[in-house]
Amino acid sequence: VEILKGSQSSVYGSGAIGGTINITTKKGTKNQKGDFFYNTGSHGTNNISISKSGEKLNTNYLVSFEKFQTDGISAMSHNEEKDAYRNNSFLGKFDNQFNDYLEIEGTVRLRDTYLQYDKVIDTATATHNEEENGRHYLASGALTYKPNKKFTNKLSLTSSYTKRSYGAAAGSGNSIKDNYYGERYSYGYMGNYNLNLDNSLIFGVEREEDQIGYNKDLTGIKRESYYTTSSFFDYQKRISNNL
């Protein structure tokens, strides 16, 4: 995990104009490897993780599944209602090095969540039975072409979808179910040309398309959409080894 402050648009696109958190997942290694992890704790807490990684025919791969759940605790002074949480996630990742010039990589991530929480309600008799169901998927792919050691070209495509449903429960602050949806598609090209050891150029273009939908109180889905197209150019020069 890498936290970068300040504008990072020249490297990570227009969405990183105020900074970015760069999370790099593990790649498969040459040796076949399988991992199993399980722990448990109080309040019905259980966590299990299974993963498999390796390399075959110049292709690195990683497949993992994780399940976390807990019954939660009650922080309210007038009832014993606990706030449970569940998170099931799947990750698949591959990287294929065709030759010295061409590489392709892809990632698929799925997540299913359930959350109970206490909403601020001004009545002491409320049971605070708020709950949220969430589903999220992300798929991304990238093609990298290096015609020579100085010039690197990268085409990328990312698609994501999120759905959040807030359930209606007796004594809660939500009397009718609410649904919220979000979709994002991102397309981009980035080029990196190293003129020499001290000078380099970074340039590219990116387009992001966002669509949102909400169905509050089941009154009908309302949709909105927008897009952003951006280009960037960055020249970097190293004056000395320390500057």
Task: Please annotate each region the language model reported.
Residues 3, 11, 15-37, 48-50:
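N-terminal periplasmic accessory domains that precede
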Residues 3-4, 32-35, 73-78, 88, ...:
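Extracytoplasmic loops and strand-loop junctions of Gram-negative outer membrane beta-barrel proteins
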Residues 6, 24, 37-43, 55, ...:
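Outer-membrane beta-barrel pore domains and translocons
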Residues 7, 14, 19-20, 73, ...:
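Gly/Ser/Thr-rich helix-start
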Residues 10, 22, 30, 51-132:
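Periplasmic-side early beta-strands and strand-to-turn transitions of outer-membrane beta-barrels
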Residues 15-17, 39, 44-48, 86-88, ...:
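Residues that define the transmembrane beta-barrel architecture of outer-membrane proteins
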Residues 16, 27-29, 54-58, 195-197, ...:
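A generic beta-sheet turn/junction motif
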Residues 62, 95-113, 130-243:
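Face-selective signature of the C-terminal outer-membrane beta-barrel domain
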